[in-house]
Amino acid sequence: MFGLKVKKKRNKAEKGLILANKAAKDSQGDTEALQEEPSHQEGPRGDLVHDDASIFPVPSASPKRRSKLLTKIHDGEVRSQNYQIAITITEARQLVGENIDPVVTIEIGDEKKQSTVKEGTNSPFYNEYFVFDFIGPQVHLFDKIIKISVFHHKLIGSVLIGSFKVDLGTVYNQPGHQFCNKWALLTDPGDIRTGTKGYLKCDISVMGKGDVLKTSPKTSDTEEPIEKNLLIPNGFPLERPWARFYVRLYKAEGLPKMNSSIMANVTKAFVGDSKDLVDPFVEVSFAGQMGRTTVQKNCADPVWHEQVIFKEMFPPLCRRVKIQVWDEGSMNDVALATHFIDLKKISNEQDGDKGFLPTFGPAWINLYGSPRNHSLMDDYQEMNEGFGEGVSFRGRILVEIAVEILSGRAQESKFSKALKELKLPSKDKDSKSSKGKDKADKTEDGKSQQASNKTNSTEVEVESFDVPPEIVPEKNEEFLLFGAFFEATMIDRKIGDKPISFEVSIGNFGNLIDGGSHHGSKKSAESAEEDLLPLLHEGQGDVAHDVPIPMASTTHPEKPLVTEGNRNYNYLPFEAKKPCVYFISSWGDQTFRLHWSNMLEKMADFLEESIEEVRELIKISQEAPEEKMKTVLSDFISRSSAFISEAEKKPKMLNQTTLDKKRLTLCWQELEAMCKEAKGIIQQQKKKLSVDEMIHEAQNFVEKIRFLVDEPQHTIPDVFIWMLSNNRRVAYARIASKDLLYSPVAGQMGKHCGKIKTHFLKPPGKRPAGWSVQAKVDVYLWLGSIKHASAILDNLPVGYEAEMSSKGAGTNHPPSNLLYQEQHVFQLRAHMYQARGLIAADSNGLSDPFAKVTFLSHCQTTKIISQTLSPTWNQMLLFNDLVLHGDVKELAESPPLVVVELYDSDAVGKPEYLGATVAAPVVKLADQDYEPPRLCYHPIFCGNLSGGDLLAVFELLQVPPSGLQGLPPVEPPDITQIYPVPANIRPVLSKYRVEVLFWGVREMKKVQLLSVDRPQALIECGGQGVKSCVIQSYKNNPNFSIQADAFEVELPENELLHPPLSICVVDWRAFGRSTLVGTYTINYLKQFLCKLREPLAPITQVDGTQPGHDISDSLTATESSGAHSSSQDPPADHIYVDVEPPPTVVPDSAQAQPAILVDVPDSSPMLEPEHTPVAQEPPKDGKPKDPRKPSRRSTKRRKRTIADESAENVIDWWSKYYASLKKAQKAKERNPKGKKGNTEAKPDEVVVDIEDGPKKKKDKMLKKKPKDDGIPNLAILQIYDGDLESEFNNFEDWVKTFELFRGKSTEDDHGLDGDRVIGKFKGSFCIYKSPQDSSSEDSGQLRIQQGIPPNHPVTVLIRVYIVAAFNLSPADPDGKSDPYIVIKLGKTEIKDRDKYIPKQLNPVFGRSFEIQATFPKESLLSILIYDHDMIGTDDLIGETKIDLENRFYSKHRAICGLQSQYEIEGYNAWRDTSKPTEILTKLCKDNKLDGPYFHPGKIQIGNQVFSGKTIFTEEDTDETVESYEHLALKVLHSWEDIPEVGCRLVPEHIETRPLYHKDKPGMEQGRLQMWVDMFPKDMPQPGPPVDISPRRPKGYELRVTIWNTEDVILEDENIFTGQKSSDIYVKGWLKGLEDDKQETDVHYNSLTGEGNFNWRFLFPFQYLPAEKQMVITKRENIFSLEKMECKTPAVLVLQVWDFERLSSDDFLGTLEMNLNSFPRAAKSAKACDLAKFENASEETKISIFQQKRVRGWWPFSKSKELTGKVEAEFHLVTAEEAEKNPVGKARKEPEPLAKPNRPDTSFSWFMSPFKCLYYLIWKNYKKYIIIAFILIILIIFLVLFIYTLPGAISRRIVVGS
């Protein structure tokens, strides 16, 4: 279509294929010339592309006629998995609201959990851990939404503050499957205009089986930039605007006509109603919300024209939109089909022009699900709900998705361009369509504006949109599907008793049984036939006859025959006559989408195959894999360039959607970027890459291209091949239509188009256990537009005659059968040599394997090899008289495939299926010279499970006219008539010697209800073997008394063909019976191949005694203590390792220590003076490492300094722990990726540059003045993120541990076979070619024994230190646990039940235990964490196991970690029984090194000289003391730099071990911080154990005096006067201690906001200075039996309130201060400013723990506005001081405060009503009152005067004077 000329397939065709129909080929060329642009005829472009030759080690046939060979015959089905979602809610900040009581709820699916309620704060601190367990298929589980909401808690109806949503898939796709220390942005779903509602700091992790959780350090509690650390994936913008997601549903077609209601079916039966029995509606789900359309009654082709509108922040944290079509039922609705659209595939997150918003369609979505039968009960309903692969087409739906950014802020501009493009109608559609679309858009815009005015919530809206009844009749094109069945074999006997036929369908076309109406063209089969054009044009100018094509989508039913040699399989005799199917379907012409996908997929396939080829080159150690890799990348660049040049032309397509254009641009831009990278790799621009790195980069390219291949907008539905038994569907294969699509341009053609592809049919739905193949079908399929129909037969194997369905049809129809008249006789030789790594099918953990080899209609079986997982058959199976039809050259290029199935033979019952593989035979024709083929491994698969490898090769030999005598001769058979594999095919063997180290067996479980007591190990390889001695009593000593043995065996010279080595352990029982206990098979021996070691001679030449004497002399001369080298030798440390030699002055070497990286970012200031190679210089200014005598004094000095610095905090082991934690955290911050390979520091350089936890002031001084002798440095230890074994290769440097398996292997436990492990074998192997002359063999001692300690019992003192645990799984219903420790070692069990820690998931144990043990009997240490229960048995939370023996004997010296500094006493006292000089002397002796020689200022080992300070000055006496311990310790830390024998020695450390529970295998149940020390009893006794008991929190009392308030806002208004006032009082408490809230008295009627209080609050609390946290111990609720302890930052809350008499008090403002870090107070009320307070920098903040006493003004705020100021004084005293100098609360004794001098207006109305009248009325209005009073008297006088005047006058007149 686009004319990209990647002539891969064409070139091959031209190289030597004989075409059946040359005219068709010519006409195809003509068609191509007519249709394509002139550039398409450029021939040379094809040369850019290399041949698609098969590059796998399996010899496969040429891919010209057949599709690429796939050895995996079945895809695995979707399996349920266990997942654990762990969420830690740390704290919230900036929550919106006033005086809120926030509580956090977490909802995942139907599960809901809730945190505790925090009172009266907008910044609550929780630090609570929640765990959710889910089981289900990954793909569906990852759509679950985690919804975290923060509510304001009320007794009735909590109020939502804000919420946050993210789906599990987004979390799982993060590095380490987790978000760590991130801030979730909270928004109000009810009103999206209100913006941010606060931030919630949390960790979210999603862990599957076997996933390892990477721990991240908790960041400090200081003010961190929240906006820069939001909980969003990398690459997302920090500000996410709101957006509307429109999902427009136009119509659906071809839905299954089914109604789930019984009455509907009854009605149909009686009335004969032919209406569509389906009432469809669509449900769209996104981001945890769901909207549904209206129901269209009785309609299989419904039209909705409705849009579902979601509102979500963009980009969303939920990946998929779920579209589900339902059938409404009277009882319940039934899902018809489900489809998911991944937003990542319809958008691009990149910035700039490259990025585009999610956009989709309008495009059809093809729906798949269960078979379209109209049965009432659907057995496969799960498929319709999206579980598993759909087995049938269930209609299609026309959908459009668009996104509109709502925010009017700056973000809109970023997306506006894309949005406009999205809104524009497609110009490629005709004008009618454009108008309709435009109208729809306008209407939609109008509606959406209306809607936004109506509601701003995130509620889903569903509304109709106006479009013409028909959007635009998309231009349908007719496609022809043609298929020819070449082989149908391996048909299961159960379904082979009825006639078998095959049906091929695409959509509902071709589906004759239950297809329903044909959608698309809406034509009946008859009318469709009439319109068809002649397809196959005569090439010789004959007139083409326009005869319609009948539809033939099903082969003729035929009764199958029984396969020769295997009654379980039947076959259909398609020998000379190959049945064909063909039919026409009608679909929208958007095949350009599939063409682009095919081009990209071919690029990805080619690159992947090339990478595999390079890997093979590396395996067989051939030269120049680098050059090959560069060639591969060059080819990739040329292919990409060809694609880009075509894509940049942006060819005009009909029916192109916005997404089509955007995707095409994205594809070429991505390829352009990849090309640039590939060029950089070829030219090695940035840095020189190794081959492995180049392969890794190329693999990334493949993954990127594969992502682009997947086309979200469907076009032609998938093709289904169904096998019908008596018209009943029994098995199917599903093929993507793009793989079959034809294009005149070779590069755009589907990879299986016009090729014979082998399909293994599978039954629909869940597969039964032990299922095998249903049928093997070889079918040729071709799908393409009718205009290309002349090419349907082009690639068929030549030599056929086309047989038409009816004689009158002419020759222009597709044939109904292909007749291959030519036949040839072949012989197949199956050379079955051996297999390895098979699945265990018997209860004893072994199998009795045999193989069935099936070829065409023949099957043969190998002999059974009993009781093995690595059988060697060495058998040749001969298949004679095989008749193959067709051209002989075609058969040579594309032979039929051989299927090998492996079974386990059982005495009772049928054989058990172990797996299968597919191979292509090597063909040799009669006229070719014979060359013996090479054996190679074929991978075996049992379903999705890897089932081992088969070493075999298959030859297909053409029988010449002279008969079988003309074939290469075979070796004569043995007595049982079994032919061996010919000698010229068998591998070339050499004599090897296998040395075996037998150490012992461990952890043996019961076998057949009896304990193992007398085990023996049997080693077997290549038919030879050796037995160990029998252990006489496993209980007393599980080690073998004879340590080593050897045997000789003939092994292939090619290392890749080496047979497996099997380890079997048997138990000898009474009466000479033996029982197999367990087995282990080593499939790859390469790890045990030993090269002949030349360096052995020099090592033995070294005089082993001389260095010892020298050392001892020099020691006596220089060291007063006399560290003698001849001290007791524990049996350890005897192994050599090659390490690069360091520079002469080793100590400052920059070589890194990967595992030590966490603690070693800086070089040590203390060691810097020692680095100079000065021998006898006087001591420098630097702080000396004190020798033993003065160390007590130095410890005192340390104590003093620390006490001055950190609130009388005594230096102890925890000081070292917190310093190490801080160091580790800083190292991770500097190196966030945590690259272990970082090489900037050494353990000896880090040992001292450490700050103490609580203080920062001195840290800076340490950095600035590293040599300041006034400041001591804390020693630190190494804190490992994982267990110690993972850092030191499991301590398997001297012996390896092999797990012995027993019992059947199942797919469920693959990879985590914990239940099958019956015990462990400890030993090792050394394999090397046998020396030619026997004299050169080692005399006496075997090579493998050199350096191995004796394995007699050793008594050891073991100290186990348990520091803390974190993230334990909750064991109680309330989501907490009461953990305690149980330790088991042999028969010793220590239960620490009394010391359980109540209600805690992150307990600090600080416990140490001492056990005496005897190795090897008691060598497995188990540490279990139990949950303490008052009633019932205690529950196990998790356990971890440590093999102490491996550590004890390891050359890494894991018995006691080397400390960073040498000291005699104090917190860092030397723990080991041997001093550093003694350890060094012993290491040199064991490794036969010359030395150590001690000289002043240096130590010499061989030719290495280590310089450093050895003379120290005693401060008190000014005496000089000589000590070599410090320098010796430094040498030990650099031991890995010693040439040949050096290795890393274990430093003082804490390991973090994961805890597991047997009921949840592979799922972490928490982590444990601990370490183990071991001391042999034959050495001097060690000192007392380290005291790691937890620090007790220190008691403090905070005295807060509230003096005055100013400018408090006035809330009340006088009803008479309108004057504002407030009745002010202040409330205060420490966060977490809300029960101890304290209030001042009320300052009534404050008219200015001023309040006078003179009121004292007293807050006693417990505090840990090192952790800067307050410890709160309280009962969780009234029903709790025990108090729980929690740690929280010490935060003081002060609030100002307005007192109300009749209603609840009014909240006016709050002030929260972290007592560790709060802004300085203002000196006056005027200077007190809210902005200054909130924006105070860390440097200006102060700590009450340093200042002790602070007084000043601080601001109150409400909704981020200043609402008042308070003058307060804070005074911090310790509990002891508070007891000595107590003060009274409020204004009470002792030390009472004076009453405040309040204004006269301050009083209560109720208490003093007259005062109230006086002050509020009389004082303000007295003149008005007086005037009013006078006026009233005057008025009364006047009234009385007027009233009495007439009477008086009349009386006067009458009476007279």
From Swiss-Prot:
Membrane topology recorded in Swiss-Prot or TrEMBL: Single-pass membrane protein
GO CC aspect terms: membrane
Biological process (GO), any one: positive regulation of gene expression
Keyword entries, A-Z: Calcium, Membrane, Metal-binding, Repeat, Transmembrane, Transmembrane helix
Alphabetized InterPro entries for the sequence: C2_dom, C2_domain_sf, C2B_Ferlin, C2C_Ferlin, C2D_Ferlin, C2E_Ferlin, C2F_Ferlin, FerIin_dom
Residues exposed to the Cytoplasmic side: 1-1824
Cofactor(s) it depends on: Ca(2+)
Amino acids binding Ca(2+) 1: D842, D848, D904, D906
Transmembrane segments: 1825-1845
Highest taxon of the lineage: Eukaryota
Comp. bias regions, Polar residues: 448-459, 1113-1129
Gene3D superfamilies given in the database record: C2 domain (2.60.40.150)
GO MF annotation: an example: metal ion binding
Compositionally biased spans, kind Basic and acidic residues: 37-53, 426-447, 1178-1189, 1226-1245
Residues on Extracellular side: 1846-1857
Residues annotated as domain C2: 65-181, 225-356, 810-937, 969-1099, 1338-1457, 1578-1729
Protein name: Fer-1-like protein 6
Alphabetized Pfam families for the sequence: C2, dsrm_Ferlin, FerB, FerI, Ferlin_C
Region listing for Disordered, in residue ranges: 15-63, 426-469, 1101-1148, 1161-1203, 1224-1246
